[in-house]
Amino acid sequence: MPSILLINGPNLNLLGTREPHLYGSTTLPQLEDNAKALAASKGVKLESFQSNHEGQIVDRIHEARGHTDAIIINPGAFTHTSVAIRDALIGVSIPFIEVHITNVHAREEFRHHSYLSDKAAACIIGLGTYGYEAAIEYAVREIISAKYVY
């Protein structure tokens, strides 16, 4: 069965309560449940992982090698700082989609640079939590369908 790994980085465990005017009221468990249901409706298994620790995210990316077809990642603040996550994603050769709930380009200057975007199969920015659904749709249509016949 095709599979997607969904990774959420630092502070995304606070979704639903952290700055709801920016990030909305959907909690991380709700987001993950919705993502799993959408993926399952398309015949795809989705695993989710969240960590506030860079090394744990790197380790989880490494573990995906060989049995994951696509990665959807919201790296949170690590977007702007983590060469390690960039190198891990490049190293496992799994296509990935970078997702951000807010439009990072309309926010503080330091949020405008991503260490991941130039290597991503796609970037989905500013669509709220719907961005995760869009990422799943894209992963199934453009990445997974190239490997599997539906």
Swiss-Prot record:
Keywords: Lyase, Quinate metabolism. It holds the Pfam family DHquinase_II. Substrate binds at N74, H80, D87, I101, T102, R111. The active site is at Y23, H100. It is an enzyme of class 4 (lyase). CDD domains: DHQase_II (cd00466). It catalyses: 3-dehydroquinate = 3-dehydroshikimate + H2O. Pathway: Aromatic compound metabolism; 3,4-dihydroxybenzoate biosynthesis; 3,4-dihydroxybenzoate from 3-dehydroquinate: step 1/2. GO terms for molecular function: 3-dehydroquinate dehydratase activity. The keyword Iron does not apply. Homododecamer. Adopts a ring-like structure, composed of an arrangement of two hexameric rings stacked on top of one another. HAMAP family: AroQ (MF_00169). Is involved in the catabolism of quinate. Allows the utilization of quinate as carbon source via the beta-ketoadipate pathway. This is Catabolic 3-dehydroquinase 2. The gene is qutE2.
